[in-house]
Every structure is written in C-alpha cells, then in structure tokens.
Amino acid sequence: MVGLTGDDSAAVELVPSLMAFRAEPGLPDIQVRVEWTDELTPASGLQLFDSGALWRLYECEAGFQFDFRAPVFGDEPYKRLLVNRDFSRATLQMSAEVSGAFPYAAPLDYPVDELLIMHRLTQEKAIELHGCGIVRADGTGNLFVGHSGAGKSTTTRLWMEREDVEILSDDRIIVRRDEGCQDDRAQKQVPPLRFANGRNDKVFMRNDKPSTRNYNASIRNDKSNMRMYGTPWHGEAAYGSPGSARLGSIFVLEHGAGNVLTRLSASQAVAELFARSFVPFHRHEYVESALEFLQELVSAVPCYRYAFEPDGGAVERVLELCD
C-alpha cells in the first residue's frame, strides 16, 4: 500500500488511471508526504542513473533522490522524490511555480507511481513483468510476456474475441508469492501495492482485489503458489485492473508460424523473464533479488516459448494445453 499525504486536496489528487486502484486508509507499506516548494535546488549527490528522458537518480543523505523533468516544464526539475533506502518513507517535493502554471501535473503521475512500486518490489518477493495477464471464466490465470511489439495487445484482443475473460493489464503485471495460497478466494490476499485519502489528506492505491472468476478452478495447479496482479500501466489496448488471480502458466510471446509451444527449462525461463522484467539495474542487490525470485517463480509455474500467429488458432492452442 502507498499512502499519500499532504496539507490540501491537491496533494492527494490522483490521475484518472489510478482511480480504480484507490483504497480505504490503512497501514501503508510506502508513506509519501507531498510538499510544495518555491525552488528545487540542483542535485548535489552522486548521480546513479539517467533515464535519458524523464528522470535522474542520485544518492542523498536520506537514501535516494529522483529528479523529474519534462520539456514542457523547462530544463529544471519540476518534482523531486526523496526516499529512504528500503522505500518505505518518502517526501515528494513539487515545484509551486510549475503546479500553478500546469495544474494537471499531479503528484503521482507517471513515472513517479511506477518507479515507487518497482523499487519497493525489490524489498519483497515480487517482480514487475512486461506482459498481459488474462483470467478465464473458470479462474485460470495465464501470463503472456513479451517485448514491445511481441503481441501482448494482439493476444489480449484475440482472447476477448474468443471467450469471457478478465484482463488484469495488457502491458504490466506484478507477480508475487501468494501468501494465502491454500485459502479460499474470499480470503484477503497479500497485495504487492495499494495507494489512500483524507486530510492530512491521504490517497491509497491498491490492487489486492481478487478476480471475480471462480477460484476453485484456478487451483488445479497445486504446485503454483504464485499470484499475478493488474497494474494501472497499460499498453495500446488500454486495460488495467486492480484484480488478481492465481498464476497457472507463463508464455513468452514471439511471432511465428504454426502456433508452436515449447516448454522452457528453468534456466531458459529465468533468462527470458528477466529480459522482460522491470528491475532497477543501478544496484546489484536489486538485480540479485529479482533473479532469486524468478528462480522461485519458474520452479512453481510452467513456462513456454510461444511462436504464435495472430488469429483465433493462437487461443485454441493454449486452451488445448491448459484444458
């Protein structure tokens, strides 16, 4: 859970894509305090990373400093995130000048929200993957991962045309160990993130809501203790749900002929998933944590390379495997 606090309603304003993830107040995993400042002084710490576009990362006394820039706001940072080393407490400083001239610059707009969660996941047994999560009517959860252009949005549309499915996201999925894997679906699952509001206004974002699909059917793979969660960060098909589902199978998408499925070895699966993950590469311990979790993931969930054609036969081939 991410708790967002501030002295007025503007401090906890959510962009539309986050509204479905709003939650009631509770004990946050990440507490963020929003402040407005007249001046964001130049960064003085060691630069750790430069995204080449929207943000730069520095070391600071508290832990880490993220400076965010955008051409429309000029050359200087328009917001700054100061966060401790375990990503549990942060201060988000907003330029009062920019906020006054551009009121649509909300505190948790992209990429602040995703960077917070991506880094927090390094402290837990969890990872964000570049993929689409599809939940069938019987509760079966399948994850289709792929680089940009590999066919995630196409896969989403093919499944929606074929049967009644729930799309958790068509571009970003979080996977974590299901701490309540033997419990009934109605049991509260441990979420990877949530965001909350009030005053000292708070806004939470959450995605711990189980899918509305039939849970009992989704536990046919008794070995799987992994769960996938929707996120607000969608692709061209624009699907982002706060739902979650037990993860049954993972498919690494690539364009091909004949809709060919090939079971991957554990080492192959780890390499393929790591190449399609969102991991902070600026610290070796974050990379090591991600690799350790991926090893656990592929030992629990079968992974396949899927060379597919963009037609209904691609769905039928997966159904043959899963049914």
Protein language model features and the residues they cover:
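A noncatalytic interaction/capping subdomain that flanks phosphate/NTP-handling catalytic cores
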Residues: 1-148, 158-166, 173-177, 225-323
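Conserved glycine(s) of the Walker
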Residues: 150-152
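Intrinsic disorder/low-complexity segments
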Residues: 177-227
